[in-house]
Curated annotation (Swiss-Prot):
Subcellular location: Cell inner membrane
InterPro entries: LrgA/CidA (IPR005538), Uncharacterised_UPF0299 (IPR022957)
Name of the molecule in the record: UPF0299 membrane protein CGSHiGG_01475
Record field: transmembrane: 1-21, 33-52, 60-80, 92-112
């Protein structure tokens, strides 16, 4: 029981430190990116470079994910409270969302097509090289 409590506290402390560092970065680098996103990027870098081990944060992260719906209640209440303001500004909110979604879909589509073509080209090139090697072996 004590060990599980220690693991929970350790994971929440690590997640809190990442959030704090993210907020610190957001304060000193005024790029418009929220501190929580910077914190997630730092956590991602820590996990991919294995500076932070997954089992160190697993318990706290699973606890937060389990209660994620409760964490969205204040946001939902805010949307309901300011729904008249959102309706007034719908064209300002809707047009950029639609345009950015379309641009994202186009970029991903073209990139996927390009990468598929490159993979096909690489596969064909390997076949040609293998065929040439076989021809050279047969000629000798």
């Amino acid at each position: 029981m004590i060990q599980k409590l220690f693991l929970l506290v350790r994971s929440l402390v690590i997640l809190s430190i990442m959030l704090y560092l993210g907020n610190l970065i957001a304060y000193y680098i005024p790029s418009g990116v929220p501190g929580s996103i910077w914190g997630l990027l730092l956590l991602f870098l820590g996990l991919t470079t294995r500076v932070i081990h997954l089992n160190w944060i697993y318990l706290g992260a699973s606890l937060l994910i389990r209660f994620m719906a409760v964490l969205f209640v204040p946001v939902s209440v805010g949307i309901i409270k300011y729904s008249d303001l959102l309706i007034e500004q719908i064209n300002i909110l809707l047009v950029p969302n639609i345009v950015s979604t379309c641009v994202t879909l186009l970029v991903i589509g073209f990139l996927g097509h390009y990468l598929y073509q490159m993979q096909s080209f690489t596969h064909k090139r390997k076949k040609v090289i293998k065929r040439r090697e076989n021809q050279v072996k047969q000629a000798n």
